[in-house]
Amino acid sequence: VKRNWLESPILYMALIGRPGANKSHPLSFAFQPFIEHDYCQNQEYQKLYAEYERTMSMSKKERMEAGLDEFPKAPVRRRFLVSDITPEGLSLIHAQNPRGLCLWSDELSAWFKNFNRYNNGSEEQFWLSVFNAKPTISDRKSTQSSIFIRRPYISVIGTIQKKILGELVKGERSSNGFIDRILF
């Protein structure tokens, strides 16, 4: 073992089965505590954001007189799960949740197909880098500033049908090591 070697337990997992083989229900059951946690966090965020908006609607003088911060910070929604998301959106959410995230996709075929949704394959490269916990830098004109995540921690889990999986592993995915990173 090398002294300075560091690995993250990032997992990409897929439950494989026939259509109607009851793949989704066990996964939903296992994720229920995470869903409940994220729901409670979202409820708290909604309250904090309503208070933030109320505070921001006040003038600076009114905030000072009320003993509030002159420039209050917007609340952050804490979460563990994400679903249908772009790499840019994921980077923003991960920056707000540095302990890590899990992409939960009931049908992983949608995740695979999204790799070319906005551009030509760079999303697959993003996921190859994330698996190895390599730094991600998101510089897009639609974002207010650059997002730098030194050591991303994003796991992926979902279900897929055997026939669809066979179609998705054709081409570069089988030669660039992407498919090898998924536990089936």
What positions do the PLM features span?
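Phosphate-handling catalytic cores of nucleic-acid transaction enzymes
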Residues: 1-184
